[in-house]
Amino acid sequence: MFGTMEIEEVAKALSSDTRLKIIRLLAEGEASAVSVFKKYNERFSDRRERATIYRELEVLYKSNFLVKTYREDSKEIVYRLAARSINIDLITQTVSAGP
């Protein structure tokens, strides 16, 4: 899942308050980009444009924090967390999925 992702990559992916809030939303369960966009703007005072939410979802996906799946029944792509937690090895400075 995370493979040999380095601490710098994780830090960069998690350095955005918007991305951290998206992770918080997806901790409640999988959701489409449109659903994340709507929930984000309902729940948080720092409203974001749809393009911003889509871009941040892709950053999290490319950083292996999210899994992206196409739902045949609803004809949409949904995102979910790839892992509930991560482990950081300070000696090798790598990151892996937690238990």
Question: What is the predicted role of each segment?
Answer:
Residues 61-71:
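A short, conserved structural fragment
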Residues 92-99:
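Short acidic DE-rich linear segments
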Residues 17, 25-35:
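Short capping segments at the starts of secondary-structure elements
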Residues 15-16, 71-92:
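Short, cationic-aromatic polyanion-contact patches
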Residues 46-62:
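Short amphipathic alpha-helical interaction segments
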Residues 34-45:
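DNA-recognition alpha helix
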Residues 1-24:
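Short alpha-helical segments that sit at the start of domains
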